[in-house]
Amino acid sequence: MEKGMEFLPVSREEMIDRGWYYYDFLVVTADGYIDHPSFGTTLIARLLESRGYRVAILPQPDWHSAEDFRAMGKPRYGVLIGGGNLDSMVAHYTVAKRRRTRDLYSEGGEMGKRPDRPTIVYANRVREAWPDVPIVIGGLEASLRRFAHYDYWDDKVRRSILFDAPADLLVYGMGESATAEIARRLARKAPPSELTDIPGTAYITDQVGELKFHRADAPGYEAVCADKAAYARATKIEYDEHDPIRGCAVVQPCEGRYLVVNPPARPLRREELDALYALLYTRQVHPMYKNGIPAIEEVQFSITHNRGCFGGCNFCALAFHQGRMVTSRSIESVLEEAELLTREPGFKGYIHDVGGPSANFRHTSCQKQKRCGMCKNRSCLAPEPCPNLDADHSEYTELLRRMREIPGIKRVFVRSGIRYDYMLQDKDRSFFKELVKYHISGQLKVAPEHCVSSVLDYMGKPHFDVFLKFWRQYQKLNEEGGTEQYLVPYLMSSHPGCTLSDAVELAEFLHKNGRTPEQVQDFYPTPGTLSTCMYYTGINPRDMSEVYVARDPKEKAMQRALLQWSRPEKRALVVEALEETGRTDLIGYEKKCLIRPRKGEPYGQPPVKPERPERPERQPRRKKEASGNRGRRGTPTAKPLAQKGKMSPRKKAAFAKKRNGK
């Protein structure tokens, strides 16, 4: 491996091989070490390395003691801790709270390589190992738990993760600019207690003095535990102030102290993103993992070209993590990475994805937000697109065109989420046409999620007629191009606001259109989303209105079964759901029916077969006549015999030609 392309050291032996007798920062991660820009830990570590710091990685340490944390010695400036690319509780448990059997971010997919809530566990072990070292926590797990939050797995409200993880600072969001500033100040020996004015960070204080930012007060931990309406109000404040331009510092009291969450850091500019992705990554799994790490398979030949999402889905945590303001890399930066992939071992000519949170976003949704920030209480796309929406795919189309022309690349696919509602707003159909023609590998996955308008409003999704319009145009483009490509809709059951009757309506639509989804996602209440707030409180934080919530496991199972009505093992639940909703008319033999009744069930009668008319008595056979043409059963044919001496005009003409020698 060429100089400058080594993995970062993961042991004291590797530090010695580099000639290091000290190092500056220890980066602890709950994932196995993959040196690829799709992993946040790697991005942060390589960024610090590019700033001249010596950085070591400690992936998935043994958390039962502090020995692994001491193994490389004490870092000069601090320890940075991340809980992994995926929330650890989602990685470990299904929505039914059953333990998963496979962890894609660990060697060989083996479970048990990290604890539940590793950010808390690791921080406590680091504090045990080195009581005076500065500790900074970050990543998705910490970011979504920066405020007091409802924890689905414990079924209770937990305080901010900063009160459980003995860290000095929390970095939320993507974190590059905040981490770089923290590192700069720690290297200058600034005490962590003075690092209170950095955007994109949170800290705990005994007294809230004068703040650098405008202040917004949220209901405290005790209040949100005791009153669900207070929890909903706190959630709205947290979302409203999550803006790098107009956002305030949010202060939340907790057990006699105060959590202060500064406004988000501004998104990286295009040139900063380009520089970040141009750093030297090996793009490989560390060789210490003999059985590999499955997570590399999805991203090894994929490219991230954007950040942020203004889609506004209430059940998605990305907006609360990356923010709603979209930024993207330059075309040249993305093409350079594509050319790099063509030289990678194992590359077979296929770019698996050119995407991000939403693949077809390349710029902010409107020019106004660059000056004023994102709008409060409004979504750019749902339920109706904003009049100021700037829907333009021209740059993305150019990017994909130029990538297709790179020598060594056979196909370029787009597999990240496509926002079809945004695509339909673009008057230029070039991107849609080229997407269908060049960038789909047999099927396109989109996320309408449901078909009932009230449910879609709670989800923050566009109404279903938008999906139907897209579906028709997609089919038309495939017909015109002579291609047979399928549309795979993602669907969700049991989202707050979705009743059993709503699930029946969705099942009817799927049945009518010949759709039998293989996979259905139950709503998963993860920290930091508006939908999770609705699930816990039964209140929509946007307007404080009451929301129906399916909490009973039996009802959730029935909603899921309705969307998979054709599976034999789901039949009993489907029957029970149809009985409960008074829709037993969907059990029967009519075309509209979801399932047929079984013998002895009091539903629908089989269609009555029409009685066959009695056959007329057979007539005795007549004796065969001496002459005349006869049909199959001896009856005369309709064509009469030709009269003797007569000749048809056609035969007359033929005879005349023969006679005249022609």
Q: Could you describe each region identified by the protein language model?
A:
Residues V608-K662:
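Intrinsically disordered, Lys/Arg-rich low-complexity segments
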Residues I161-G173, A561-Q605:
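Amphipathic alpha-helical packing elements
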Residues E14, G32, G40, P59-E255, ...:
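Glycine-rich beta-alpha loop elements in corrinoid/cobalamin-binding modules
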